[in-house]
Amino acid sequence: MVVRGAPAIGVAAAWGVVLAARAGDDLDQAIEGLRASRPTAVNLSWALNRMQSCDAAIAPIDVGQLERLAAAIESDDRVLTQALVNHGVGLLPKDCRVLHHCHTGAIATAGVGTALGVIVAAHQQGVLKHAWVDETRPRLQGAALSAWELGCCGVPSTVIVDGASGLLMRRGE
């Protein structure tokens, strides 16, 4: 996966449509090619549907209009992820410990990240005591990406094997 994280995939797809339009490619074909690249990614289909609706509404193709829509999709993701983080931090008790699975950080979105963004913000606001990060097999997104992002932000964290999460929860850690 070159681009991973549902929000980032949607944003990349929107800009992919813009690049196809600039190149003079058949947009329906380009959109279907992008859609087939990761058919289970909800944001991919959502962004491509928005871009396709814009394309269908204008003839001839207005690249500027497509660029504005792609920029709006990217901007919306920034705003929505920040709102999610702001709300999520308010739900966490002081000195909490959290268990994070997979990767939901800033490099998976156009903004600050989703669940991992909440963890980083909780650390910055003095709410978080520790983050446990599942390795997330088979691609190891937790060990490779989440742990890296948390380390870059100075968040105290420990990578654990996926099977250890049940033990941590049983112990109340």
At which residue positions do the language-model features occur?
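Glycine/serine-rich anion-binding loops at beta->alpha junctions
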Residues: 1-9, 40, 98-112
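Buried hydrophobic packing segments
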Residues: 13-21, 48-51, 88, 115-122, ...
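C-terminal binding/interaction regions
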Residues: 35-97, 101
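Glycine-rich phosphate/diphosphate-binding loop of Rossmann-like nucleotide-binding domains
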Residues: 110-159
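Glycine-rich phosphate-binding loop
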Residues: 155-173
